[in-house]
UniProtKB/Swiss-Prot annotation:
GO terms for molecular function: electron transfer activity; FMN binding; heme binding; metal ion binding; oxidoreductase activity, acting on diphenols and related substances as donors. This is Protein-methionine-sulfoxide reductase heme-binding subunit MsrQ. One of its GO terms (cellular component) is plasma membrane. Its cofactor is FMN; heme b. Belongs to the MsrQ family. The lineage of its organism: Bacteria, Pseudomonadati, Pseudomonadota, Gammaproteobacteria, Pseudomonadales. The keyword Metal-binding applies. It comes from Pseudomonas putida (strain ATCC 700007 / DSM 6899 / JCM 31910 / BCRC 17059 / LMG 24140 / F1). Binds 1 FMN per subunit.
Length: 203
């Protein structure tokens, strides 16, 4: 296994936050509605992991270090794990497993539908994030995994629809996402290694 310590560090970070939040909930440190706080934090955690995942390719182009690409799949699976926990928190703490209430929620809060579409996209990515799927799908695999950009857009829309008024935090996530998308424009992506080489010579 390449870069085991880097992989281990990502695993520890991924586990640490939910465990810490559970500890805070057990110690009554999350206020009067700990379930909602947990749900919100897991959602933001998933969005953060998604942005970090999307930053791996630009970082590799800028630094030339292959470790960024090696952990990209692991980071993507953490996005999926956090989203699953986010949904479970919603079902348990907000709905109380009342499935009849779910239909009411979908009518009242269409941003839930947007989030569900994002989850389905992540599910497709997680299920096919293995070498067997790469071999089976061939060139279609790369096209399928461009779905991650739609997932990012749906995640940001879901977040925007929830906050509505105070957009400062959302704007930070959206700005980072926009920068990462610009870095994927072919002309910009091709220029990144040249920029890195020029900086290296300057140093």
């Amino acid at each position: 296994m390449r870069y085991p310590w880097f992989r281990l560090a990502i695993f520890v970070v991924g586990c640490l936050f939910p465990v810490w939040w559970l500890y805070e909930a057990a110690m009554n440190l999350l206020g009067p509605d700990p379930g909602k706080i947990m749900m919100d934090r897991l959602g933001l955690g998933a969005l953060t992991f998604l942005l970090v995942t999307l930053s791996m390719t630009p970082l590799q182009k800028l630094t030339g270090w292959s470790g960024w690409i090696v952990v990209r799949r692991q980071l993507g699976l953490w996005v999926f794990a956090y989203i699953v926990l986010h949904i479970l928190a919603y079902l348990f703490f907000i709905l109380g497993l009342d499935w009849g209430q779910l239909a009411v929620e979908l009518r009242k809060r269409p941003y839930i539908i947007v989030g569900a579409l994002g989850f389905l996209g992540l599910l497709a990515l997680a299920v096919t994030s293995n070498r067997y799927s790469q071999r089976r799908l061939g060139a279609r695999w790369r096209k399928l995994h461009r779905l991650v950009y739609a997932v990012l857009g749906l995640g940001l829309l879901h977040f925007l629809w929830i906050v509505r008024s105070d957009l400062r935090e959302w704007a930070i996530y959206a700005f980072i996402g926009a920068v990462l998308m610009v870095l994927r424009i072919p002309a910009v992506a091709r220029a990144l290694p040249r920029v890195a080489r020029k900086q290296g010579r300057a140093v």
